[in-house]
Amino acid sequence: MGKTFAEKALGKAAGAPVSAGQVVIVEPHFCMSHDNAAPISKTFKKIGVSKVWKPDNLVFILDHAIPAPTDKHAENHMQVRAFVKEQGIRNFYDITSKGGVCHQIMCEEGFALPGLIMVGSDSHTCTYGAVSYTHLRAHETVLDLV
């Protein structure tokens, strides 16, 4: 039997053939987070790292609670904006005209392309499989370690 799409994409990223059930370590092409990037930025600082490793591989999109329905949401948005600026993250989609639904932006802006691998903090990252994009869902407390 031939390889699955996931086996092909992960094997390409790992530089060696992989099979179902095998544990492999690969570097994702992109990591995506949305409004929950505020807790990510807090955890990032707690682990004692001053700069993100590859800011151009990060995509932050504010799309879940916009406009901010509560003071807490507004505070989270401010924390995300501050973190993005501090870290030099250029792939930031705020609630302005550049913003939108995270999954739509990932596809329309060319982050979700066939054969690439992405780790996202949203439970619907599986939708990228529709465009042959390998996706892995990570809890926001894990995404800061990727």
Predicted features and spans:
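N-terminal low-complexity or amphipathic/hydrophobic leaders
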Residues: L10, A16-A74
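Short active-site loop/helix that positions an aromatic residue
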Residues: Y128-Y133
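Hydrophobic alpha-helical segments, chiefly the membrane-spanning helices
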Residues: L145-V146
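Active-site-proximal helix-loop elements at catalytic-domain edges
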Residues: P67-G99
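Non-transmembrane, aqueous-exposed alpha-helical and coiled segments at domain scale
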Residues: Y93-V101, I105-G115
